Amino acid sequence: MAEKVIMLGNEAIARGAYEAGVKVSSAYPGTPSTEISEYLVQYKDDVYEEWAPNEKVATEVAVGASLAGVRSMACMKHVGLNVAADPLYSVSYMGVNGGL
């Protein structure tokens, strides 16, 4: 039987990303999403993690990795999604090779 683990939401997101095979994660820090990247650091041997100067750049890093065939993730708080809108609109037309 699987072991039950109690986690905070952001910790569970990081664990889920790791278990789903995410290899690249880029994030713009801001509460409450900052902790996702902080929890991902524990998987540093398997996941490349970086802070981005803004949400658009974080999304572009994740899109670039995905276009190269690597499963990736961009983390930001919901109000930063408007800053990341341009690359999100573009990738919706281009498609991806790895998961995003």
What are these regions (language model features)?
Residues 1-7:
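Active-site mouth loops of central-metabolism enzymes
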Residues 4, 12, 27, 49-53, ...:
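Residue-level marker of alpha-helix boundaries and capping positions
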